[in-house]
Design a protein with these regions (language model features):
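NAD(P)H-binding glycine-rich loop region in Rossmannoid oxidoreductase-like domains
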Residues: 34-91, 95-98, 110-114
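Substrate-positioning beta->alpha
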Residues: 91, 152-153, 170-193, 199
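Conserved catalytic-site region of short-chain dehydrogenase/reductase
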Residues: 75, 110-122, 146-151
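Conserved beta-loop-beta element that borders a ligand/cofactor-binding pocket
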Residues: 108, 129-152, 159
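SDR active-site strand-loop-helix element
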Residues: 5, 29, 69-70, 104-110, ...
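Short alpha-helix in the Rossmann-fold core of NAD(P)-dependent oxidoreductases
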Residues: 82-86, 105, 124
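N-terminal Rossmann NAD(P)H-binding glycine-rich loop of SDR-like oxidoreductase domains
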Residues: 1-24
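Mid/C-terminal beta-alpha module of Rossmann-like enzyme folds, strongest
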Residues: 187, 191-254, 264-290
Length: 290
């Protein structure tokens, strides 16, 4: 039995589709099973989430492999970025060890570091360390920015494109190697069959693109190309923090999310790790049919 967290997310939903198609026995840790869509009738359900450590024990019963994709890039009513990423992963690892799990696959991010400027990447570094320090057979998968046609970010950009111009936080020069969610999912599924996997896989697409160009491409893919307006970081920070103070968790965007788009996520390994798993990531032009 495989336990999948984050099954309703961008990568998790793609992984789940591939696992159920391959008839892999899957249990999903979810707060609302309805968000699994049609896949919910093909899997076991364990009610719970990262903010509910007691739910881990039931979810892990009889599990041999954990694929831990769940994450939070903003504070939520049920927990902070640090609690839902770093501390929750540490607790999940402890519960997995107690349950006799064999392999723990953790989904991190390129650039995760205890000294990073962003709270998210610092929390991911804490989570990585908890996994690496465990007695479990462990694998860390660290992708660059992940995208998919119709994902939340593209939907947000489409809404922003109703305006004459689309704002971009800062200078937009942060560099990424964008990788399609389905290519990441293929890597995860391939990893499950690997007898002696590497301890770490850095997943990236075939090209290095800055944030300005990524935004422009996604707008073209949505059929709404627009001029981009670079807004100085201090102005973005003040505006988003003020919005968060008023709207709380309902804010359409947060400073923590915007700040992530000012941090490069690249690897000198390029697509090498994905290819080790038998996956040749497609370019944005190929995937989005630009």
């Amino acid at each position: 039995m495989l336990l999948l967290t984050g099954a309703t997310g961008l990568v998790g939903s793609a992984v789940l589709r591939r696992l159920t198609a391959a008839r892999v026995p899957v249990r999903c840790l979810v707060r609302d099973p309805r968000r699994l869509g049609p896949e919910r009738v093909r899997v076991q359900i364990a009610l719970g989430d990262l903010a509910d450590p007691p739910s881990f024990r039931n979810a892990l019963r009889g599990v041999t492999t954990v694929v831990h994709l769940a994450a939070a890039i903003r504070d939520q009513p049920r927990g902070s970025i640090e609690e839902l990423n770093g501390i929750a992963t540490w607790r999940m690892v402890q519960a997995a060890e107690a349950a006799g799990v064999r392999r723990f696959v953790f989904f991190s991010a390129l650039g995760a570091s205890a000294h990073d400027r962003t709270r998210f990447l610092r929390a991911k570094a804490l989570a990585e360390q908890a996994v690496l320090d465990s007695d479990l057979e462990h694998v860390v998968m660290a992708p660059s920015i992940v995208y998919a046609p119709g994902d939340v970010f593209m939907t947000l950009l489409s809404r922003m494109a109703l305006s004459p111009v689309v704002p971009v936080s800062g200078n937009g020069r942060a560099r990424y190697q964008p990788i399609w969610a389905d290519d990441v999912a293929r890597c995860v599924v391939a990893l499950l069959d690997a007898e002696q996997p590497q301890e770490r896989y850095e997943l990236a697409g075939p090209e290095v693109v800055d944030y300005t160009e990524i935004t422009a491409r996604l707008l073209r893919a949505a059929g709404r190309p627009r001029p981009l307006l670079h807004v100085p970081t201090p102005i973005v920070s003040r505006a988003l923090r003020a919005t968060e103070a008023i709207l709380k968790s309902k804010a359409p965007a947060t400073w923590d999310e915007a700040e992530l788009m000012e941090v490069s996520m690249v690897t000198p390994r390029g697509t090498a790790d994905a290819q080790l798993l038998g996956v040749s990531p497609g370019s944005m032009a190929e995937v989005l049919k630009l």
